[in-house]
């Protein structure tokens, strides 16, 4: 079942490409026709590729992966931040920092610095800092928040990357290709489809088009998160966590006690069943109150009647 309809794509203007003077010949296979000097994108192909990208994102997140949302152009900044925050995924909607992926160790140090500054009370001058020092720290925090705030919870390189306007975000795509990170992206008629593993032909300039496609990717991530949390319940086992030594000893003692318990119960059950069998055999061999047959009962009744007739009647 398609996650979006062609009518929705048409209403959001996903089918509008760039003018004929600004196009990449490699995108020719995704172009349906040309109207008034503007290329029209084939939405049938877009629909199929959206479903493919949706399934990939869902499976990636379901298996514990993360999707980095990237879109620094004005048309994409708001929807990138909104949808990424909705599903708890990292995002970059300001300037892309060179080396964010290829030099992630250094970036991670700056993220730790940002978390340290978040704990500072800039209005409290009794902690040993002067007002000037607090002002400098506040400016540093604001600068880090603007550039790294969207990836503050990113502990390792992402599993995949969603990109709006692959031509503008060429630095991010180059770093992802060096690290072998799959890229899902909107391909307008001026983009290179060879740079993206999961292309979605569409309009990357219209706000409604960008918002719709970004929401679809976020919905796929949300569905993957639901599957991830349902897996331990379905399989009946939660992911193992490291135990302390004393916890491990208690667990081993409990396992040993459980291993001995069924043996004792089996012995008791065997003894009880043996007694019941012996008792039933004795009752069958020598019944205490065996029921009388119908013939014996009739003979007894006739004898009592005869005796009563022979007995003398008292005057």
Curated annotation (Swiss-Prot):
**Record-level Gene Ontology MF annotations:** structural constituent of ribosome
Q: Per its UniProt entry, which superkingdom is the organism in?
A: Bacteria
Q: Name one GO cellular component term.
A: cytosolic small ribosomal subunit
> Which NCBIfam families does this chain map to?
rpsB_bact
Segments for region (Disordered): 250-315
The annotated regions of Basic and acidic residues compositional bias extend over 272-282, 297-315
Q: What is the lineage of its organism?
A: Bacteria, Bacillati, Actinomycetota, Actinomycetes, Micrococcales
Which keywords does this chain's UniProt record carry?
Ribonucleoprotein, Ribosomal protein
Q: What is the name attached to this protein's record?
A: Small ribosomal subunit protein uS2
Organism of provenance = Clavibacter michiganensis subsp. michiganensis (strain NCPPB 382)
Task: Family membership, please give it.
Answer: Belongs to the universal ribosomal protein uS2 family.
Listed under GO biological process in this entry are: translation
